[in-house]
Amino acid sequence: MKKKLTALFAAALLSASAGVFATGVGPQLNFDPVAAPRITPPVWGLACSAKFDDIPLYFAGAFNIIAPYAYVKSDGTPVVTARLGFQLTADYWFMNPEIIGLWHWFWGLGGTIRTDFSANGKNFYLSTGPRAVAGMNWFFADGFLELYVQQAIQPELQFAFGEDGSANGVFGVPVYFPSSVGLRFWF
């Protein structure tokens, strides 16, 4: 009974706050090719994007996978595994003018923070950096549904810990080129 009451209270609170603020939330698919000192496969990710009217930022939280991911241990042994990670981005759009009718374009700047770990549990990665983003969006159903595509450039400062970083925090500067497509439902 207590769980049902808590769930009912949370639903009522969410409904009340949705009526006060316009919120856009929806799924996003990411494909992030990378330019790095060594050959690295692109990052694939599934994200949830969000925009709140009272905050001038577009947010996304993503689960990413890089597979296969290869590195060489300090003893020279090659290892092939996968990298799994979580990423948060926040972008400020400077413009979102109409091209024609439902079709708009946008550009802006933002930032990202990413944490990855190898599937074999031997490595941990921490990255952060700025990003520049541009894209197009379309609004349907009186602004209820937003479809968007975007492209970004995202240089990151990355620290590797564990076998891949010789256990001491090897520093790298990969440059990602994230491409995203997604939907936002506005309520």
Give the location of each predicted region.
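Short glycine/proline- and aromatic-enriched beta-strand/turn motifs that initiate or cap beta-hairpins
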Residues: 18-79, 184
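Membrane-embedded beta-strand positions in outer-membrane beta-barrel channels/transporters
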Residues: 24, 45-49, 87-91, 131-133, ...
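Gram-negative (and chloroplast) outer-membrane scaffold detector with strong preference
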Residues: 54-147
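Short, well-structured alpha-helical patches and their helix-loop capping segments
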Residues: 126-128, 171, 175
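Outer-membrane beta-barrel porins/channels
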Residues: 132, 145-147, 152-170, 180
